Amino acid sequence: MNQGKIWTVVPPAFGLPLMLGAVAITALLVHAAVLTHTTWYAAFLQGGVKKAA
C-alpha cells in the first residue's frame, strides 16, 4: 500500500468511516442524477413497454 503513511496523519477510526461515507454519498448522488436526468432509466426499472398480443 503506497498510501500507508496517511494513517500517521489521520487515525483509521476517523479516516475509514469518512472514506466509506464519501463513497456511499457519491454513489447515491450518481444514482439520483441518473434517475432525474434520463428518460430511459425509469422505464428500464419498470421492465419496459409490454407489447399487445
Curated annotation (Swiss-Prot):
It is a single-pass type II membrane protein. Keywords: Antenna complex, Bacteriochlorophyll, Cell inner membrane, Cell membrane, Chlorophyll, Chromophore, Light-harvesting polypeptide, Magnesium, Membrane, Metal-binding, Transmembrane, Transmembrane helix. A bacteriochlorophyll binds at residue 31. It is found in: Cell inner membrane. The chain crosses the membrane at residues 15-35. Antenna complexes are light-harvesting systems, which transfer the excitation energy to the reaction centers. This is Light-harvesting protein B-800/820 alpha chain. It comes from Rhodoblastus acidophilus.
